[in-house]
Amino acid sequence: MGKLRKNLLAWAGTGVAAACAVTMTAVPALSTPEPEAAGVVSASPYLYNGWGNPPSPTEVMNASGIKNFTLAFILADGTCNPAWDGNRPLDGQDKATIDAIRGAGGDVIPSIGGYSGSKLGEVCQDSQSLAGAYQKVIDAYGLKAIDVDIEATEFENDASQTRVLEALKIVKEANPGLRTVVTFPTLVNGPNDVGKRMIDKAARIGSDVDVWTQMPFNFGGGDMAADTITSTEGLVAHLKSAFGYDDATAYAHAGISSMNGKSDTGETVDQAAFQKMADYAGEKGLGRLSFWSVNRDRPCDGAPDACGGIDQQPWDFTKIVAGLQS
């Protein structure tokens, strides 16, 4: 969810945002057209085993009520082969995390890609081999859903965009019921030209992505709740244009992945702003609400991989996402 994930930036400023009370208003659950698979997609914040001091997922589940997590990040191991962070095997530490989450009644959606590292969409030379790499991840964990976080050159390059979309089409056809998420950067008014090109391409080739999730931050400031809603409305408008969706269907194919606390550029998403995003997501029936990251969703000790840089209680943002579970 931005450069803080692997290229930690110098902390901008030393002040901590003022305390912000969270009012947990009741809102409708997010859109769940296929309940078993959709649950892991619709409300699942990011958890990253390869960053800082990751929290125990079962402790977070018990304290917050969250059921599902998006696990970051699967990269290429130097070849067209998937590995956590490009170096941890699929059957290692991260599988133990998945087993623990499932043992506690939850589930996971792995995130493939991210801002940094060697991306499968660039290393794999064609859509068939890329689909094969995705399939290895699906088979390793018996997945109901996958997230492709497409950023940087993988996002900007037309050929790698095409490989990703074609590979997602292949794995959806090979795995009935599998849900696919594409997460990508955006502007205040919605997708940039590269994002629009990607969505238009998916419509042309028949790549049936279930949820297009924007990362509405690193805008440089402003009202983060209002800007997020504006950006999402821009996404919804383009989905309607590209696919011919009606309003309800377009909202169900749109998602938000915010960044709790301080963003890479020093913006602040506090609890009240994130609650407004959650209210909007529930009211509109969005297909997904997430944030970067559970690792940062706790009181701050000054390290950007361990906290969000604002005054908060443990798991404030995770609890907000949990409020949207079906």
UniProtKB/Swiss-Prot annotation:
The keyword Cell membrane does not apply. Keywords: Carbohydrate metabolism, Chitin degradation, Disulfide bond, Glycosidase, Hydrolase, Polysaccharide degradation, Signal. Residues 1-35 form the signal peptide. Gene3D superfamilies: Glycosidases. It catalyses: Random endo-hydrolysis of N-acetyl-beta-D-glucosaminide (1->4)-beta-linkages in chitin and chitodextrins. GO terms for molecular function: endochitinase activity. This is Chitinase. The lineage of its organism: Bacteria, Bacillati, Actinomycetota, Actinomycetes, Pseudonocardiales.
